[in-house]
Amino acid sequence: MQNKIVKIGNIDVANDKPFVLFGGMNVLESRDMAMQVCEAYVKVTEKLGVPYVFKASFDKANRSSIHSYRGPGMEEGLKIFQELKDTFGVKIITDVHEIYQCQPVADVVDIIQLPAFLARQTDLVEAMAKTGAVINVKKPQFLSPGQMGNIVEKIEECGNDKIILCDRGTNFGYDNLIVDMLGFSVMKKASKGSPVIFDVTHSLQCRDPFGAASSGRRAQVTELARSGLAVGIAGLFLEAHPNPNQAKCDGPSALPLSALEGFVSQMKAIDDLVKSFPELDTSI
């Protein structure tokens, strides 16, 4: 199977290319924090030679509680994104939830993301595809890896073949997620070789059945990320925070920003090793 390459400026995203780090924070908490987090990622990835894309949401529209922080909104969020691009020269990925958001967001950022809970909403998928932007599709927690092929087809039917697929875990009973490492190759096959990335942060979520916010398993972020890269994928999706215990969203799953360099260094070593192996022919 031929691996497709999705280009984001001078970055090649493909399953057989060096992994790309899609890293940042869960939600924009402030302009200053976004600058701090982005600068930390840029310094680490430039030092280690890892391709990098900044990620954050301007609106967490699917929070469990009506009282939870959602973000600064689209208008203010896009101003922050533009400043990050102007200051650090980074590429940016963010999610959209409404049809009217698609074009204005695509005019500023480099990748627009289709949220997992909305991935089968055809009108939204079509509106995103018609912007011509690169699209990152989050696999819904309730969908099998093979079913991602249908979402890819919707996007391609609109004339857009710049597609990245992202696994963020699968429902395992109530209030728990697991990651099927065999699912990455299934998604590659279902999409005829599209780049597949792994959202290690959100795969660590663990819900409190009676609570208003998700818990998480931060202590296992390294082992889960290592496992994902070991199967040969295009990138990792990671959230880090200066103080995860004070984060306004998903802090229990976020990597401490102080641990970023050690984490990325390990991931690069694993990715380099895995992609140095020749592909084995196991057919009969």
UniProtKB/Swiss-Prot annotation:
It catalyses: D-arabinose 5-phosphate + phosphoenolpyruvate + H2O = 3-deoxy-alpha-D-manno-2-octulosonate-8-phosphate + phosphate. InterPro entries: Aldolase_TIM, DAHP1/KDSA, KDO8P_synthase. Its main location: cytoplasm. The keyword Acetylation does not apply. Pathway: Carbohydrate biosynthesis; 3-deoxy-D-manno-octulosonate biosynthesis; 3-deoxy-D-manno-octulosonate from D-ribulose 5-phosphate: step 2/3; Bacterial outer membrane biogenesis; lipopolysaccharide biosynthesis. Keywords: Cytoplasm, Lipopolysaccharide biosynthesis, Transferase. GO terms for biological process: keto-3-deoxy-D-manno-octulosonic acid biosynthetic process. It comes from the Bacteria. Its EC number is 2.5.1.55. The keyword Cytoplasm applies. It is an enzyme of class 2 (transferase). GO terms for molecular function: 3-deoxy-8-phosphooctulonate synthase activity. It is found in: Cytoplasm. Pfam families: DAHP_synth_1. One of its GO terms (cellular component) is cytoplasm. Belongs to the KdsA family. PANTHER family: PHOSPHO-2-DEHYDRO-3-DEOXYHEPTONATE ALDOLASE (PTHR21057). NCBIfam families: KDO8P_synth, PRK05198.1, PRK12457.1. HAMAP family: KDO8P_synth. This is 2-dehydro-3-deoxyphosphooctonate aldolase. The gene is kdsA.
